[in-house]
Amino acid sequence: MAPKGKVGTRGKKQIFEENKETLKFYLRIILGANAIYCLVTLVFFYSSASFWAWMALGFSLAVYGASYHSMSSMARASFSEDGSLMDGGMDLNMEQGMAEHLKDVILLTAIVQVLSCFSLYIWSFWLLAPGRALYLLWVNVLGPWFTADSGAPAPELNEKRQRRQERRQMKRL
């Protein structure tokens, strides 16, 4: 049963600690996926490793680097001169936040990278990321913009106001 009342807010220190743990967790995922990929593809099957295997590794490293750097800059905390925590950074575990999408990109890349040890065609699953981005763009930005009313309809005037406006226009002429 859910607790009654207002949901408690989390303090700066708790957000700071959770952000550190989240970054550590995703760094482990990145290092683990790269270790598995390099071990299987570039060590065991070195003789059959093609140019595309190296390109896939470079692509995944670029995606990991950009995503992790964005997450760490979002979670950067600020401290006062005496060393006390002033701001714990943006909450990386916030639902529907940008960090959630970055974490999804890291997880998708790790899964695709490990599965691509069996076949390089698995990298086509990475097209899910731009597909999801286009979906979110349509649902949150473009769809409402295209389907929005062109403007507020003109308020209908009652007869008295309409006659008054007509008289004013006649006086101006």
From Swiss-Prot:
Annotated transmembrane regions? 25-45, 51-68, 105-129
Localization, per the record, is: Endoplasmic reticulum membrane
InterPro entries, per database record:
SND2/TMEM208
Q: Which membrane topology describes this protein?
A: Multi-pass membrane protein
Question: Where is this protein primarily located?
Answer: endoplasmic reticulum
> Where is it found, in Gene Ontology cellular component terms?
endoplasmic reticulum membrane
List residues modified as N-acetylmethionine. Answer: 1
* Record keywords: Acetylation, Autophagy, Endoplasmic reticulum, Membrane, Transmembrane, Transmembrane helix
Task: Supply one GO BP term.
Answer: autophagy
Spell out the family assignment given in the record's similarity comment: Belongs to the TMEM208 family.
| Primary role | May function as a negative regulator of endoplasmic reticulum-stress induced autophagy.
Q: Which PANTHER family match?
A: TRANSMEMBRANE PROTEIN 208
For this entry, the protein name equals Transmembrane protein 208
Originating species: Mus musculus (Mouse)
Q: Which gene does this sequence derive from?
A: Tmem208
